[in-house]
Amino acid sequence: MLPKKKIKSKKRSVTRLFLAGCGTIVVLLLAFCIWVYFSLFSGQDAIQTSPHYPFKSVEAKEKYLDHYEKRSQKWPVAYEDQMIQTSQGETFVRISGFDDAPPLVLIPSAGATSLLWTQNVEMLADRFKIYAIDNIYDFGRSRNTRPFETPNDLMLWLDELFDTLALENNINLMGLSYGGWISSQYVLHAPERLHKAVLIAPAATIIQLPGEWAWRGILSAIPNKFIMRKVMVEWAFKDLAAKDDAASQTAIDDLMNDAILAIKSFKFKMPIHPTVLSDHELESISIPTLFLVGENEVIYSAGDAIARLNLVAPQIKTEIIPNAGHDLTVVQSELVNTKVIEFLLDPMQSDSR
């Protein structure tokens, strides 16, 4: 049996080791948070004057644009690209479809580009003139020259973009996730310019985003495939990740490769946190609007979101997409495309203004 002094000494050693371990973990977490801030979310003032802005370096710009061009080769239909100049900077627009078809503007999710719609554009371009944009304050080929601080800055950007594209007041507008939130803001801002709107799993908008979304987003900002897949892909895109066919796995690889290279290449800062629309704002939506959500959505409960809309804004058409989560435009692309086309072309879905 050990003497009491030796037992106490051993306990103190274990305690010191435990405290040292905790301290090391805290330091590592703090260092990681500092790295995330300075690597990803640092403000633009220090770099906006550089010739390679919004990229971290000339080399990063060249590597990213080369990758982007190769990925563009997977766009399944013919397209014309335009760089549109506005007072906020320049916006890259990928245009497909027939000139005399009704216009459909596509706004991607945060951290994505116009290439997000690769699985959808073939069906949509048969019926619409597609304007797929790279968000001016996100990854891709667009480049802002002024800061974005309020939703009104985004609205001014879209106003000028639509004016320069000579889009008349019959625009169909569709956005996914963060792009869905931007679309909802524009529905409130300029309903007279829109024909119809489609909100696909819009970030916040209907229900507040969960805290889990935040910490998963931070961890998935680590440019590592294993971490990104475990932390974000298998959570938000679990229906797609569960598929073992080559097309699904290629879609996941493309998604992760795009995101990891963008994280390494860009100085990025999300300018405006997506907000939940008030009951009054939802009630005031007068243009025909479709809300699409996957049954396995993780940013909020699909059932709760539709229940709120049915209660406060029954004029908004709602649809739940089976066997899909936040990946619904990919894992159920044909069904989503069909729902969108039917809604946008349905004469019974008329303006209630």
Positions of the model-derived regions?
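Conserved HGGG/HGGXW glycine-rich cap/lid loop of the alpha/beta-hydrolase fold
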Residues: 95-140
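Flexible "cap/lid" loop of the alpha/beta hydrolase fold
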Residues: 188, 197-223
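Alpha/beta-hydrolase fold catalytic core
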Residues: 2-103, 128, 345-353
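Conserved alpha/beta-hydrolase catalytic His-Asp/Glu region
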Residues: 208-210, 225-284
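Catalytic histidine-centered segment of alpha/beta-hydrolase-like enzymes
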Residues: 324-333, 337
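Acidic catalytic loop of the alpha/beta-hydrolase fold
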Residues: 296-300
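Short beta-strand/loop motif that positions the catalytic acidic residue
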Residues: 285, 291-293
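Active-site loop/oxyanion-hole signature of alpha/beta-hydrolase fold enzymes
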Residues: 132-174
